[in-house]
């Protein structure tokens, strides 16, 4: 028997794939977007940019911006009863409307 893979992108065939017309990098405005401390954001992973990518299990979650570290934002999300801190590049974040 072969050993099961435990890689970062396992079980993400649909989650981290793009439509053929949407291939390539997103527009620059997505890279340069700014967020305020306390603002609510959605975590939507951009599969073509790997830096600052959160774990795929957090895709679709909503969190609160707590601060900034370099280019990345510090986002807190609630996972059950725990509060988890993630460091996410702004290309993987969308503001909540």
From Swiss-Prot:
| Gene Ontology cellular component list | ribonucleoprotein complex; ribosome
The text of the family note is: Belongs to the eukaryotic ribosomal protein eL21 family.
UniProt cross-references to Pfam families, sorted A to Z: Ribosomal_L21e
* Molecular function, one GO term: structural constituent of ribosome
HAMAP family documented for this protein: Ribosomal_eL21
Give the source's domain of life in one word.
Answer: Archaea
**Entry protein name:** Large ribosomal subunit protein eL21
Q: Does the keyword Ribosomal protein apply?
A: yes
State the UniProt keywords alphabetically: Ribonucleoprotein, Ribosomal protein
Q: Where is the composition biased (Basic residues)?
A: 1-24
Summary of subunit composition and partner proteins? Part of the 50S ribosomal subunit.
Renumbered to this chain, region (Disordered) spans: 1-25
Q: Which InterPro entries match?
A: Ribosomal_eL21, Ribosomal_eL21_arc, Ribosomal_eL21_CS, Ribosomal_eL21_sf, Translation_prot_SH3-like_sf
- Tell me the GO BP annotations in alphabetical order: translation
């Amino acid at each position: 028997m072969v050993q099961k893979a435990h890689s970062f992108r396992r079980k993400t065939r649909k989650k981290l794939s793009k439509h053929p017309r949407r291939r390539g990098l997103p527009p620059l405005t997505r890279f340069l977007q700014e967020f305020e401390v306390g603002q609510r954001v959605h975590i939507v992973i951009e599969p073509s940019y790997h830096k600052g990518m959160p774990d795929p299990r957090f895709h679709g979650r909503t969190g609160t911006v707590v601060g900034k570290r370099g280019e990345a934002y510090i986002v807190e999300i609630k996972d059950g009863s725990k509060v988890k801190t993630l460091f996410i590049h702004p290309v993987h974040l969308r503001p909540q409307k």
